Amino acid sequence: MLWKIRKEEITLSSYIYRIDLPSLSQTIQEYPNFNFNCLSKAQIQSKEWLIRQLYECVGLSGKKIAMLGGWYGLLAQPLYELCPDITYIRSFDIDPDCANIAESLNKSLLHDNWKFKATTYSVNNLNWKEKVKYHTQKTDGSYQFMSDRFDIIINTSCEHMPDTWVRNVSSEQVIVAQTNDFDIPEHTNRCDSPDLLIEKLGIKTILYKGRLNTEQYTRSMVIGYK
């Protein structure tokens, strides 16, 4: 049972953050390398914060959303719960272990005409300004060519990557960026304030900026346009 595996790691702290528990339990059993840190209190608080502010700033109805450094895609279900008529969500992560786990966790959305789809790809190698052209792996192992447009570009992993991805975002696309000041080796691009994040990404129209203090670190977020 899931709760016997790691009950203390799972915090469902409000109505806005919902996880498909049967899919989560199955995923944990199927993928021994599952990283429970994705369910930490700080991670969930950060996602709830993003969802609330994004919804208030621009809404979600009919939106086409790209998640850069999307990890396990745990934003997808609560976004759809808040707004079921999101057009689609695509998650991109360079880590080859992420896509299968993300699709297992979001199985119902994957099977619903690919409302959610995860792809292994470097986000710095894609042009977000136009139709994004890439190949994604299907469940049978074959690859399908994709050509997707996006209204919203979400990157909650800015501390893990250089800022080159933002060069390929247009001034008409909403940027949602999160980073933190947690000092560990894999955080090669840390940022300790929303103002510094705005400067680094070249955000010119600011819809929201703020900080979230967690037990582990302070997280900065900005929503806006270049």
Describe the role of every protein-language-model region.
Residues 60-73:
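Conserved class I S-adenosyl-L-methionine
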Residues 64, 88, 151-152:
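Structural motif
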Residues 72-86:
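Conserved SAM-binding loop of SAM-dependent methyltransferases across substrates and taxa
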Residues 94-97:
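Conserved SAM/SAH-binding beta-strand->alpha-helix loop
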Residues 162-226:
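C-terminal substrate-binding/active-site "lid" region of AdoMet-derived donor-dependent transferases
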